[in-house]
Each structure stands twice: as C-alpha cells, then as structure tokens.
Amino acid sequence: MQQLGLSVIPESTGLVCVTPGPMNHRGLKYKLSDDAESQKTLELIHRMRDRLVKGSNMKSYKDELTLDWHDDMIWWGPGGIGASYTIDGYVKGHTKPFQDGLEFIKFNGHVLSSAEDDLGGWFGWPNLVMKPKGGYLGLTTASDIESEMRVVDLYRRDGYKLAENWIFIDHLHFLKLLGVDLLEKNKQLSYN
C-alpha cells in the first residue's frame, strides 16, 4: 500500500523503501548449495529463534542480540516499521515499539524452515499470537483480544553471525483481527 502512496499507517520508526536483496548480491543460486554451509545457517537462525522465544519471551535485549547478530546488521522491516541499521537502531526502531505495543502470548512454530548456503528463513501461518497493549503502529488500543501474526522471516549469515534480516508481516490480517481494517480506512481517506 505504501508503494502505491497510500498512507494508512502512521509514520514508520525506520526507513521505508523498496527492500533490496542481500548486500553480497548472492540471493540467486545458480548451483547446488553446500550442505555444510546451509546447516550452519539453519543452526544459527534456530539458535537465535530459541533464544528469543524460549529464553526471553519474545523480548530482544542488546546483550542477547550481540550473540547472534553482527553489530552493523540490517533489519529490513515491513511497512509501518521500516528498516533499521545496527543493533542499536534495531532496538530503537523495532524492538522497543514492538515490545511496548504488544504482549507475546504464544509461538505456534513454523510451517517451513530452510536454508541454502548463507541464506535461510522460515514462515508460520500464523506463527505468533499477540495481544495489544496499546499504541502498536499508532493504531491499536489495549485489549484482551488475541490476534494471529503471520510472518515470513529471511536471513543472511556472514561467518558465525547474522548480517541481514528481511521480515514480512501480514499487518492487514493481524490488525483486522484487532478491529483495525486498513483497507476500509483507506477507502474512508480516499473519499474524504
């Protein structure tokens, strides 16, 4: 919607842009993947996920992030959140607003988890259940409504840590379950 110039979500905390591919320009694979490299990537993203979900109840703390992420990491976030550069930028632009606005209820797991060489990822449909504490994307109020968050997460590993993350969140679905219909809101803005 933002690429069409439709602004139904308040200003993002990070940069909103057309999201590029991997910095190393190796997003397209023209030969068979190295199984050992693929396994390293999968193990790293699973370790990071387990630390996040099981260890800290979906809270990203800087000291934990440095265990799995390069300090100059880039997080390519979805509309309403935007991109963040460095761990400090990620904490400020995504983690804090996410944790301030949502309460983690449940992790449902992933439908698919896979890696090829230094790239890997997963998706869940839905993979999270969250409850609004108020203020998420400037659109929600605190309530006891639990909403499904459908997420696609893709990663690039550089050595022993993660360097890039592309995340796609189905905000249309998530917010509609909370009573915020972005498509209807767009219609109302268009007709006024």
Model-identified regions with their sequence ranges:
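C-terminal and inter-domain tail/linker signature
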Residues: 1-192
